[in-house]
Each structure stands twice: as C-alpha cells, then as structure tokens.
C-alpha cells in the first residue's frame, strides 16, 4: 500500500465531488474527447491531464468533469475515440461505479461514409450512415451499404470537424 505522501505527490488534479473521470484515454486524444462531448469549460469544472504515466498504456490522458453524467450516445462517442477508456462515476468524492467503455456492434448516424458514391451521401436518399465495428482495439468501421472502411483517423477527423 502506498503512503499518503506518495499518493499526495502523485495527485496532479484535485478530486471532484460529483461527476465523471474518463481514465486510460490514449495519449493525445483527451482534447478530441472534450470536443466530441461538446465541452468548452462553462458547464462546470473540467480538468485535463495529458501524457500521464500509465502502466497499462505507457502514456495516457485523463479527463475529469464535475457535475456531468454521460448518456449512452456520449459513451459510444468516447468508445470510438478512446476504446481503452475507463469511466469512473464519482459521488461525494468516491468512485461508486467503474467500467470500461464498450464499442457498440454498429454505429448509426454518428459519422458519414467517406465514399461520395455511397447511397448515404446521395441527397435524394434517406439512408442513415450505418457502420459495423470490425476491430475493437483500434476501431475500424465498415459501411453497411457500400463496404467502405473508416479508420480511427477518419473517425477522429469527422468527429472533430477537421474534414
């Protein structure tokens, strides 16, 4: 067991009373997580730690959001950006629930197919972009309609508005 001095030394950001901690985000992706959750800082206290040491990942990012709970849709977005993420639900400064995000089997209406000829990109069609999730560690999505693949870079770019 660690001494309290070691624990205090390792505590980079103060504890939050109520909210969530998104831990084990791959290094460099915390800002993307904030963007897809549409958090700008005015919602309450948001703490961000980037490139922290991690036994599991080598380096990781951490996001703490006070007064926030994630919907299932938001959890799915986080899982696309950070499939290794762990969610900690905090109440009265204690972790009451902890779980790893899980990629859904299909992703519907979140990202667009990058194939311009796909039926989902045709203005006269009412097809909603739907993808099968193929790889769980580094998500690769396959369009249900045309078979085009989206990589993690494609997903990140679309979710952050960079494409």
UniProtKB/Swiss-Prot annotation:
The gene is pyrI. Zn(2+) binds at residues 113, 118, 143, 146. Involved in allosteric regulation of aspartate carbamoyltransferase. One of its GO terms (biological process) is pyrimidine nucleotide biosynthetic process. It holds the Pfam family PyrI. PANTHER family: ASPARTATE CARBAMOYLTRANSFERASE REGULATORY CHAIN. One of its GO terms (cellular component) is aspartate carbamoyltransferase complex. GO terms for molecular function: metal ion binding. Its cofactor is Zn(2+). Contains catalytic and regulatory chains. The keyword Metal-binding applies. Keywords: Metal-binding, Pyrimidine biosynthesis, Zinc. The keyword RNA-binding does not apply. Belongs to the PyrI family. Binds 1 zinc ion per subunit. This is Aspartate carbamoyltransferase regulatory chain.
